[in-house]
Amino acid sequence: MRHTDRFVKKVVIERIGDQRVLAEEEDVVIKEERISLYLNGTKLMSMMSLPSDQDAHAVGFLMSEGVIEKIEDLKSVQISSDGSSVYVEALINHENITNLFKEKTLTSGCCVGVTGNLEGNVLRKFIATPMQISLERIWEGMEEFEMSSHLFHETGCVHKASLLLEDGSKITAEDIGRHNAIDKVMGKARLGRIDTEKAVLVVSGRLSMEMVVKAVMHNIPMIVSRAAATFLGIKTAQELGVTLVGFARGEKMNIYTHSGRVDLRACKRKRGVTLHAPNQSSSLLR
């Protein structure tokens, strides 16, 4: 049995082509589950996600929302025996937990991602980390990222997030929602007490505002995706000091904001790099 088998189910489908049924056959689909999150003995919410890394998902989500402000405030996290519930005990920011339910923003994640603290948590933050990464390392990271997405290649139905760490290692998570995947990979880093201030977040989905906000809440200075960036994603990244890189495919990429963190000097393949908004604000954001 493969480790991914517990996340999938086989169903019978009718495959259509040339305006007719070509065959009736088995297909493999993702099996999501409802995961209940309990905080300090009270049920906070239920989330639809893959039944994996539930503890990391809970911690990453609560820290992304500012409910848990630092990992030292986490007392314990436990997963129920059937994997359907996560129990977190922690010192919490009561104002942020109130805001989480007072005004929700339905994000661009097709109802999988809902957040209540998109803007308030990051008003006092700015990522000023003076790190640099070579184009070669970004391209290598993207190649590894694409090659290792086993569940996506099998089902076409998951998002993935990876953290490329300063020492060359990486942390990876997958889920049906791109917000969930980011929360999981961030939670893994926090539970492992891993420094992410010079890490690069690689994601499979578009670079929207809420993706940038999640990165800022975990002090991530750079986000890279093979997908596009949205206007608010670019604007938020520019204002908060995040380097945003989109359309990173093959030997090409678009750098939208704070390009100084990408080292172009030693690269022999930089012909495919487009700088949309170098270190200063550009007309794109006005």
Swiss-Prot record:
Subcellular location: Cytoplasm
Assigned keywords, A-Z: Cytoplasm, Molybdenum cofactor biosynthesis
Active site, per annotation: C110
One of the record's GO cellular component terms: cytoplasm
Role: Required for formate dehydrogenase (FDH) activity. Acts as a sulfur carrier protein that transfers sulfur from IscS to the molybdenum cofactor prior to its insertion into FDH.
Family: Belongs to the FdhD family.
Name by which UniProt lists this protein: Sulfur carrier protein FdhD
Taxonomic placement: Bacteria, Pseudomonadati, Campylobacterota, Epsilonproteobacteria, Campylobacterales
